[in-house]
UniProtKB/Swiss-Prot annotation:
It comes from Pyropia yezoensis (Susabi-nori). SUPFAM superfamilies: Ribosomal protein S8. This is Small ribosomal subunit protein uS8c. It comes from the Eukaryota. GO terms for biological process: translation. Part of the 30S ribosomal subunit. Coiled coil: none annotated. InterPro entries: Ribosomal_uS8, Ribosomal_uS8_CS, Ribosomal_uS8_sf.
């Protein structure tokens, strides 16, 4: 299946798997989705991920994280900000704080994908990919 917006596809698959309380979700692997998964793991939103397959059939297996006996998802919500039809950019002074710092914004900078906190610390701006809280 050909997908134009791989970032939105990844976020939708994670959102749907969270709602269904699935342990693992499969996402097509691109450089961007791998970088986003790395940041999500570093920030504690997912347990782990690994790249499977070869060539065009490469995909990521992302292990989702749940809390407590009731298995409440760690990821409450995901929201795509910059879309193919309307790109959203911000310099380091204009970077948003998600829920007063409780969530993160993923920013695509010249030094790769990072959180809004890291980009603000490094004095970098870039494209605001999504909000996660």
């Amino acid at each position: 299946m050909v997908v134009n917006d791989t970032i939105a596809d990844m976020l939708t698959r994670i959102r749907n798997a969270n709602l269904a309380r699935h342990q693992i979700v499969q996402v097509p692997a691109t450089k961007m989705t791998c970088n986003m998964a790395t940041v999500l793991k570093e920030e504690g939103f997912v347990q782990n991920f690994e790249q499977m397959g070869e060539g065009i059939e490469t995909h990521l297996m992302i292990s989702l994280k749940y809390n407590g006996k009731n298995r409440q998802p760690v990821i409450t919500a995901l929201k795509r900000i910059s879309k193919p039809g309307l790109r959203v950019y911000a310099n380091h002074k204009e970077l948003p704080r998600v829920l007063g710092g409780l969530g993160i914004a993923l920013i695509s900078t010249s030094r790769g994908v990072m959180t809004d906190r890291q980009a603000r610390h490094d004095g970098l701006g870039g494209e605001i990919l999504c909000y996660i809280w």
